[in-house]
């Protein structure tokens, strides 16, 4: 259980940081808070940030090829090993409900037309900040997808961490 949780924290933290970086970049462009409505067309306007947000939403939902999938799989397997079928049912239902929201963000970014190009010039311009946000998103994408392919080393690290923490 602890090993699965520690593994899941790796992609979950990356997905959280990445999605917040995307929102921060969008708020900076619009000079107002981000809503699903003002994400319309964002995936086409800003392919890196829109693609990143797509990867993060799919990861949160537990789609394959993301660390979110592996993390949920290991968490559900740990619950099954302990006989906590009720927890698996709650997790599956929560995941199904969350799909509506996660896929809604993706739908808005790619399938709702932007009424106008919503990019606004940033007062004073700050390329370094933009570079930092894009770098954070790129790194978070790498961890989200990479944690799917590097499962064993991360599980081994989680095992060592749980042995250290609980012994």
Q: What are these model-predicted stretches?
A:
Residues 1-167:
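Alpha-helical transmembrane segments of multi-pass membrane proteins predominantly involved
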